[in-house]
Amino acid sequence: RKVTAGNCGKCHVKEYQEFMKSRHSIGWQRMLECGKLMALPKDTCSEKCEQCHNIQFKCDSCHTRHTFSTLEAKTPEACRTCHMGSDHPHYEAYISSKHGTIYTASQSMILKESQSVQSLRSPVCVTCHMPQGIHDMSFGLTRGPAGSGLSYVDRNGATIDDIELAKKREDMLSVCNTCHSLRFAKKTLTIADDMHKNIGAVIGEARDMILDLEKEKQLFPSLGEMTKIPLASHAFILGDLHVYTGKSRMERLFITLTQSAAVTWKGAYHENP
C-alpha cells in the first residue's frame, strides 16, 4: 500500500493544506494534460516524466524514505532531482550563482537536524520559496514561462490579477530584505523582469516565423503531419516545454532557443550572470 500525501496530512494538517495550494499538488494532472509529454513512448514517459510529476501524490519526493528528514528537504540537493535540466535549469542557476557558490564553499557549516536555514551564510531554495517552512512553493512567484504568451496563472489555471501579483512581489521582496536593502532587491528583480520581457519578445518573434513558414507550406514535416496527440499541434510545438518527436529542423532550432532562454531568464532571477 502506498503512503499518500493525504495520509501524511492526517497528522501534518497545516503542511498538507499548504501543499495542496502549491503547484506540486497538481504535478501529475499537469503531465496528463500535456500532449507533448503524452506523445512520448510510454517507457520514456514512465522513466522520465512520471518520476518527478508523481509528487502530486506524496511527500517523500523532498524528504525521502525512510527517515523523512526535514534537514534533507531543506537542501538544494533535494530539489535538484527534478528542478534541473535544459527546460527548467533552476538548480544550475542557483548553484553557480554567488548564493550557490557560498553554499558550496561553506559545506563545513552544513545544517544539523535541529538548525534552521538561517544558520547558513547564504540562502538555499527553501529560504526564498518556502520561507518560514510554508509548503506552498508558489510563494512570491510573479512570472510564467518566457514567451508563453500567457499571464501568470494559479494552480487552477485562473489568471492572477495585477493586485495579487503586486502582493506576491512584495512577499518575495520581504524575503530579499532579510539580507539586502529593499532598494537593491527591487532593482535586481526589476532587471530580471526586463530580461524576462525581452526574452519573451525574441521567442515570440521566432514562434511567428515558424507559423509563417507553416502557412507558406515550407515546414517539413508540417504541423498537421505531427504525431497525433490530445492537444492542438501548435500547442505541442510552440508551448512552454518541448520534445524532439517528429520535429522539422526549424522547430529543433526553436527548441534550442527556448532552452537557452530558460538558462538566461531563470539565471537572472537567481542572480546568476
Q: Residue spans of the language-model regions?
A:
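Short sequence/structural segments immediately N-terminal
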Residues: 1-273
